Amino acid sequence: MGKSFLDCESLIALQEIATNPVDLTLPGTLSQDRIQQYALSAEGFTYSYATERVDDRSLNALRMLAEERELIKQMESMQQGAVMNYIEGFQSESRSVLHTATRAWVRDHDLKDEAASIANHSEREAHRLAEFLYAARSKFSTLVQIGIGGSELGPKAMYFAMQGICPSDKRIFFVSNIDPDNAAEVLKEVDLKQTLIVVVSKSGTTLEPSVNEELFKRAYQDKGLSVADHFVAVTAEGSPMDDKTHYLEVFHLWDSVGGRFSATSMVGGVVLGFAFGYEVFFEFLQGAASMDAHALTPIMEKNLPLLSAMLGIWNRNVLKYPTTAVIPYATGLKYFTAHLQQCGMESNGKSISRQGKEVHFATSPIIWGDVGTNCQHSFFQSLHQGTDIVPVEFIGFLQNQRGIDCVLSGSSSSQKLFANLVAQSLALAQGRDNDNPNKRFKGNRPSSILVAQQLSPRIAGGLLAFYEHKFAFQGFCWGINSFDQEGVSLGKELATQIIGLMSGAAPIEFPEARELLRLFNVLQ
C-alpha cells in the first residue's frame, strides 16, 4: 500500500463517475429490485443503502478502493495486535490498538501475543467484576461515574441504550465537566451513604476526574463517611490511582485501549454491570465481539461496517459533503450521537498522514444529529431545503423497548415512529416538484437506514462496534492515524498555564492570556 489515497486508480474512477451520479428523483429509480439489491442483513441488523447516490459502477469502484487500500488486511492486523497507533519517522504513541481484545474472550478466537494477553486479562477483570458486583449491588442503590471523554460518553450512551429494556432498581449518574455545577446537581440527588463512586482515568492524573473526585471526597468527609468504602478506581496498572488502600476496588485497563473505544472494558463494565447485572454486560460484549468477527468479512457488500465506511468515503471525498447527520429513531439512543462525535471526529479529524505528511483531501466529516422524530421539528427543514446537502444515517428498530404502546387511528406509536423514519429517507432522496418554488424539494439528498428488531444489550454492543469499525476502516483508507488525539493536548497545556496565571503561581510571560483575563475581570 505504498501509494497515497489520492493516487488510487479507483478513486480517480470514482471522481469520474461522480460527474453523473445516479439520480434518485427519476421515476422508477427506487425500484423493488434496487431496494432489494442494495441491502445487507447480518448480525441482527438490516442495512439499506438504496437511497444513497450509488449504482453498480460506483459500488464496484468503492470495492476496488477498499481492496487497493487493503482495508481488511489492516483490520486483521489491528485485531491481532499489530502496532497501528503510529506516525512514521516522528515521535508518536507507537502502540497496538486492542479494544477488540477486551471482548474477544467471550467467543472463540485465535489471538496471540499482546492481543491474547489483553483478552486473558480482560476475562480475569470481568470475573473479578462479577464477584465485586455480587456484594456491591446488594449494598449500594446508586452509582456515580466520574470521567471525561471516552470515560463518560461511551458508557453513558450504552447505559441509556439499555435502560429501557433491562429491569433495574439502580440509579446511575455521570459527572464529567469540570464545571462544579455538574457535580453539584448530582450531589443534591444522591444519598452518599448508598452511593458508589466510580472514578475513571487511565493515567490517574486527568484534570477533570481528578478535580471532581476531590469534590466528591470532600462531600463524603463532610458527612463523616469513609472514602475508601465508597470509591472505586478504573485506571492503568501503576497509575497514581492504582492503590487499593484508597479505594474499595481497583479495576484495570491498558494503554492499547483508547478512551473512545473503551466501553467494553471495565470503563463501561462497572457501571453497566452495576446497573443491569453482570449477565447483561456479558450479552453486550457478545454483540460487540460478534461484530468484530463480522468486520473481517472480505467482501465489501457483505461487511456492514466496511460498506458503511466506503459509502461515507463516497459522500465525503467524491461528492464533497462536509457533514454527516446520525439520526436514531429511538429514545434510548439519545446520547449515542455524542459518543459518535468523539469516536469519529477524534479518530479521523486529522490532517497528517501516517508518513507524517500533510494530507490534501478531506478526512472526517462533522458528525452531528439528534433523536427522531424530535429533530424533524428542529433542523430537518435545513436537511430538506437548505443549501448544504447532508448525508443522513438513520437508525431504527421494529419493536420498542418498554412494551408500552397504544393504537390510534389504526397504527401503534412504534409503527408511526418507523413510518416517519422511512418517510424522511424517501423524501430526502426523491424530493417533490412544485410550481411554488417555496414548496419545491430538490431531492437527491442521500441517506442510509440501519434497522434491528429491538435495541437489546446484544444489539447495543453490535451497534457500538459497527461504528468503531466504520471509523477505523475510513482512517485506514485515508492513511491517517485514527488512534491518537494530539489535537486535545495544546488547549490543555495552555489552560494549565492560564490556571497558573489566575492563581498567581505562573510567570507573566503569557501577555495574550493575561489581557484576556483582564478583559473579563478575572485579573485585576
Swiss-Prot record:
Family: Belongs to the GPI family.
Transmembrane segments: none
Catalytic activity, EC: 5.3.1.9
Protein purpose: Catalyzes the reversible isomerization of glucose-6-phosphate to fructose-6-phosphate.
Annotated metabolic or biological route of this protein: Carbohydrate biosynthesis; gluconeogenesis; Carbohydrate degradation; glycolysis; D-glyceraldehyde 3-phosphate and glycerone phosphate from D-glucose: step 2/4
Source organism per UniProt: Chlamydia muridarum (strain MoPn / Nigg)
Stated name of the protein: Glucose-6-phosphate isomerase
Entry-linked Pfam families: PGI
GO CC annotation: cytosol
Principal location listed in the UniProt entry: cytoplasm
Alphabetical GO biological process terms: gluconeogenesis; glucose 6-phosphate metabolic process; glycolytic process
Subcellular location(s) per record: Cytoplasm
HAMAP family according to UniProt: G6P_isomerase
UniProt catalytic activity: alpha-D-glucose 6-phosphate = beta-D-fructose 6-phosphate
Active site residues of this protein: 346 (proton donor), 377, 492
InterPro entries membership: G6P_Isomerase (IPR001672), G6P_Isomerase_C (IPR023096), Phosphoglucose_isomerase_CS (IPR018189), SIS_dom_sf (IPR046348), SIS_PGI_1 (IPR035476), SIS_PGI_2 (IPR035482)
A GO MF label: monosaccharide binding
Highest taxon above the source species: Bacteria
Keywords: Cytoplasm, Gluconeogenesis, Glycolysis, Isomerase
